[in-house]
Structures are given as C-alpha cells and as structure tokens.
C-alpha cells in the first residue's frame, strides 16, 4: 500500500518533531512577552482575583464588567498563580496541552477511520500555523479544545471511561459554552455503535456530577448559579458592525457606534449581552451581503492566528 511504501508513521513522527521544535522556538522568541486583547484580559482578571484572594467571577463583576468571560479558564489561571506566582510558564503548559490534544485527536481519527487517515491527520495538524503559534498567548481556546477532545477520545464501552468523559466535557463547557454543538454527534456515534443503555447513565452521571460541583462552587464564590460565559452578544457584534475587518476592532464600542452602551453600570452582564445580541442581529439583517463577504477573511485570519 502507498502509505507503507512512504513509511507514513515515520513521516508523521518527523512532522511531530518539527512541530514540537517550532513551538519551542516560538516560546523562546516570545518568552514573557506582553499579552494583548483577550489574553491580556485573562491575565488581568486572574491576577486581580489572585491578589484579592478570591475566585472569578466576583459578585460585583456581574454589574461592573461588560461580560463574564470563560470562568473555567480564568480560575485555572488563578490556581496556576497560586503555584507559580507568574504567567511566564503558561506557554510551557500550553505546549503540554497541545501535545495532549494531538494525541487525543490522533486516537479519535484512528478509531473513526483507520491508522493511515490518523497519520495523515497528524501531518495536517502539525503544518497548520495556528497549531504552532497557539502556545504563546494566554487564551482559553487550547485549554477548552484539549478538555473537549480528550473527553471525546475517552468514549468507549467502559463505565469508568464514560464517567471521566462526562466530567471532562462538562468542565469544557465551563471553559467555553460550546459543547452542546458536540453532544448530538456524540449521541449519534454511540447510537450507531449500539452502546448499552447503562453506558448512557455513566456518561450523563459524569456530566451531572461536574455540573453540580461547578454550580455549588460558583454559588459559594458569588451567590449565583450561572456557570457559563455571557460573551455571545459581544462576540457577535465584533463581527457585525460598520467597521468590520475580519478581526477584533474596538471602534465598534466607541460612542456613536453600534456597540456603545450609554451608562453601562445601569445594566448587568446578562442585560448587556442581550443588547449586544439584538443589535448584532439587526445589523446582520440589514447587511447580509457584507457579513457573508467577510467570512473568508475571518477564516484566513483564524488560520494565521
């Protein structure tokens, strides 16, 4: 077979080696570099809570902040600061997470397809620039996807594995509330492979246990049972405004622009999210062509990271 003639596993290993070395070079170049945009905010919120001896979000932040952002990741950073007292080593943590994610994705593609496809996948993963540069910033993306794909990789007809899978995917949702998009494909997968109904119980027990623990934790630190981010509206409005350029721009939040909210302290984060969402949808309805036109630009910027 073709993949045997070209020693596909060996080629995949070579690409992994180059990929790991490239990440180490990036870490060296950007070691302790200042963070920007979301990464800067994550560090700011985590450091603030760490210095005040609390967890995120605090009760007052539901009123003072424009949104509540990915508490699962920020609380990880707070715990990390309790150990290292500096953000310098976050890229090393990211390198470990990225390696774990690649292993999980290799396992998933091997299980769904075959070893040859899994090796091709590894090669494609390693040449994607964003999968190299992602180790540098302090962002939630890699943390979220590692939990998510490790959860999916654990899905098999073993009660303990399914319990762990449920725990991981529930925490992944605490990091970024997007796991609902993956639950339906997971359901079809286990349905296709005719899992016994008892395995469903193990999986949903894991989800239920972790969700309950997170709700109790959140109630203890700020008196609310909300465990998801309120970023849907603000994320949408960043890509749905007259100054759209395919990436983040703060022009949208300047006075007179669609993202500007008069007297923001009068609204809590849920109300602000609703305002951003309704304005975004209204703009998209009025400018569907412009919104669609920038999709390729967004994809290109995402690839380049």
Segments and roles (model prediction):
Residues 24-26, 38-65, 72, 242-255:
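Extracytosolic helix-loop segments that constitute the early lumenal/periplasmic catalytic or substrate-binding loops
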Residues 37, 68, 90-97, 120-150, ...:
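Multi-pass, polyprenyl lipid-linked donor-dependent membrane glycosyltransferases
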Residues 110-115, 149-164, 172, 190-195:
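Membrane-interface transmembrane helices that cradle and orient dolichyl/undecaprenyl
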Residues 162-176, 186-187, 206-209, 214:
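Membrane-interface alpha helices of multi-pass inner-membrane proteins
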């Amino acid at each position: 077979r073709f993949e045997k003639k070209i020693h596909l596993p060996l080629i995949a290993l070579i690409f992994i080696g180059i990929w790991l070395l490239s990440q180490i070079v990036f870490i060296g170049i950007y070691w302790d570099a200042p963070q920007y945009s979301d990464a800067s905010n994550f560090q700011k919120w985590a450091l603030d809570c760490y210095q005040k001896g609390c967890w995120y979000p605090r009760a007052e932040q539901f009123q003072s902040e424009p949104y509540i952002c990915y508490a699962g990741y920020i609380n990880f950073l707070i715990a990390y600061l309790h150990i290292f007292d500096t953000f310098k080593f976050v890229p090393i943590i990211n390198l470990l997470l990225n390696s774990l994610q690649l292993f999980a994705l290799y396992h998933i593609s091997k299980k769904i397809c075959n070893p040859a496809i899994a090796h091709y996948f590894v090669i494609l993963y390693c040449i994607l620039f964003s999968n190299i540069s992602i180790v540098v910033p302090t962002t939630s993306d890699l943390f979220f996807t590692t939990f998510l794909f490790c959860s999916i990789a654990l899905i098999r007809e073993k009660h303990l594995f399914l319990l762990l899978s449920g725990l991981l995917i529930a925490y992944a949702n605490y990091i970024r509330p997007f796991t609902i998009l993956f639950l339906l494909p997971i359901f079809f997968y286990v349905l296709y492979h005719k899992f016994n109904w008892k395995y469903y119980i193990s999986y949903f027990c894991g989800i239920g246990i972790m969700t309950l623990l997170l709700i109790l934790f959140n109630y203890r630190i700020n008196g609310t049972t909300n465990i998801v981010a309120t970023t849907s509206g603000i994320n949408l409005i960043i890509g749905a405004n007259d100054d759209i350029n395919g990436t983040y721009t703060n022009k949208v939040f300047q006075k007179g622009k669609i993202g500007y909210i008069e007297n923001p302290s009068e609204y809590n984060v849920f109300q602000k999210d609703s305002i951003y969402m309704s304005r975004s949808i209204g703009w998209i309805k009025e400018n569907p062509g412009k919104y669609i036109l920038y999709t390729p630009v967004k994809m290109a910027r995402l690839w380049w990271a």
